[in-house]
């Protein structure tokens, strides 16, 4: 199973970006959560507008689904300029980037998603464009080839990535503003769900919003996706109003439990409990036990379980923590309690 098959996958599904546009905040005043990011960006944007300058180039990084694209749109709206969007894999040749840069107006925002996936050739073109607002273009071929410089209007590059560690130092150093987006707490997600419900014309109780929020894995994209599915359930099985009880029934039917775990998460945890006595166990053995490939376990299932403190990586392999046993109403084996007391968790 691939990640986008999962209801609680943080990556966008096909057509989901179009649906999310209806509920995305357009200005900082409507931006919920990330208080430090919101406060800083408000100051930076206000200062740039007072000086009548383009905002400094901005790098936004963090796990998928937390609102990097939303923040880029807000920056453009607050600055009163146009937003041009693309992504790292799309910009295959230097000419692709040059075409976008030469179409920018003064102050415009160029948003590059997955910027860590830019090819080295394209990245080289970006350096002088970011630093000096100049574009170096080669004209002709062979001995007759020559380089010419084109002046570009001042613009703001907003780069987004889920893998900040893969950015090269020269590229990372050219961003004047760097913002990390964190997972959202239940209170902020409840606010987001309630706001989205109002925009979609869905009748909802506050406790219904909270029920969806606490199962959304700290991710607004998942929260909005669950809201749409619970809305379907409310219209067919209820009177259209989302209550706490109805949301609980709908999400249980969708196999999303109170911690935001789905069947893949639970299958892995139960396999470790029943087949490997809680670990330690190697990832290859675990993959064979649940009939998934190693990459799916490492990249799709494991990260959230580790982040929530249900699993740990040790030098000897994966082990479950007390939280995993408590989740299923089980007692942790004494052997594991003793070993975790003296073994380093990586």
Swiss-Prot record:
The top EC class, named as a word, is: hydrolase
Residues binding ATP are 24, 65, 68-70, 131-133, 174, 184, 221
Principal location listed in the UniProt entry: cytoplasm
Q: Which GO terms describe its molecular function?
A: ATP binding; ATP hydrolysis activity; four-way junction DNA binding; four-way junction helicase activity
Q: What is known of its domains?
A: Has 3 domains, the large (RuvB-L) and small ATPase (RuvB-S) domains and the C-terminal head (RuvB-H) domain. The head domain binds DNA, while the ATPase domains jointly bind ATP, ADP or are empty depending on the state of the subunit in the translocation cycle. During a single DNA translocation step the structure of each domain remains the same, but their relative positions change.
What quaternary arrangement does the UniProt entry report?
Homohexamer. Forms an RuvA(8)-RuvB(12)-Holliday junction (HJ) complex. HJ DNA is sandwiched between 2 RuvA tetramers; dsDNA enters through RuvA and exits via RuvB. An RuvB hexamer assembles on each DNA strand where it exits the tetramer. Each RuvB hexamer is contacted by two RuvA subunits (via domain III) on 2 adjacent RuvB subunits; this complex drives branch migration. In the full resolvosome a probable DNA-RuvA(4)-RuvB(12)-RuvC(2) complex forms which resolves the HJ.
Protein name, entry field: Holliday junction branch migration complex subunit RuvB
Question: Which organism does this sequence originate in?
Answer: Cellvibrio japonicus (strain Ueda107)
């Amino acid at each position: 199973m691939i990640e986008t098959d999962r209801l609680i996958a943080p990556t966008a599904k096909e057509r989901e970006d179009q649906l999310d546009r209806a509920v995305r905040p357009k200005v900082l005043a409507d931006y919920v959560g990330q208080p430090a990011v919101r406060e800083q960006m408000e100051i930076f944007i206000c200062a740039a507008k007072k000086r009548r300058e383009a905002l400094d180039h901005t790098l936004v990084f963090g796990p998928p689904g937390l609102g990097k694209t939303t923040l880029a749109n807000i920056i453009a709206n607050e600055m009163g300029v146009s937003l041009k969007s693309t992504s790292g894999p799309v910009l295959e040749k230097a000419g692709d980037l040059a075409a976008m840069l030469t179409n920018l107006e003064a102050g415009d925002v160029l948003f590059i998603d997955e910027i860590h996936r830019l090819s080295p050739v394209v990245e080289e073109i970006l350096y002088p464009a970011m630093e000096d607002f100049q574009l170096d273009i080669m004209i002709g071929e062979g001995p007759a080839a020559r380089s010419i410089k084109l002046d570009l209007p001042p613009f703001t590059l907003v780069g987004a990535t889920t893998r900040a560690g893969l950015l090269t130092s020269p590229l990372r150093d050219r961003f004047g503003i760097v913002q990390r987006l964190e997972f959202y707490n239940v209170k902020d997600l409840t606010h987001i769900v309630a706001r989205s419900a109002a925009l979609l014309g869905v009748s909802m109780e506050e406790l219904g919003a909270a029920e969806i929020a606490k199962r959304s894995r700290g991710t607004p994209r998942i929260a909005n996706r669950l809201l749409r599915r619970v809305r379907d359930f409310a219209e067919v099985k209820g009177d259209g109003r989302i209550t706490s009880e109805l949301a609980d029934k709908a999400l249980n039917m969708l196999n999303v439990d109170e911690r935001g775990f789905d069947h893949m998460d639970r299958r892995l945890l139960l396999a470790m409990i029943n087949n490997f006595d809680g670990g330690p166990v190697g990832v290859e053995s675990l993959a064979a036990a649940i009939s998934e490939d190693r990459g799916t376990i490492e990249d799709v299932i494991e990260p959230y379980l580790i982040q929530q403190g249900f699993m740990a990586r040790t030098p000897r392999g994966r082990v479950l923590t007390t939280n995993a046993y408590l989740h299923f109403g089980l007692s942790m084996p004494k052997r594991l309690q003793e070993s975790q007391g003296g073994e380093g968790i990586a």
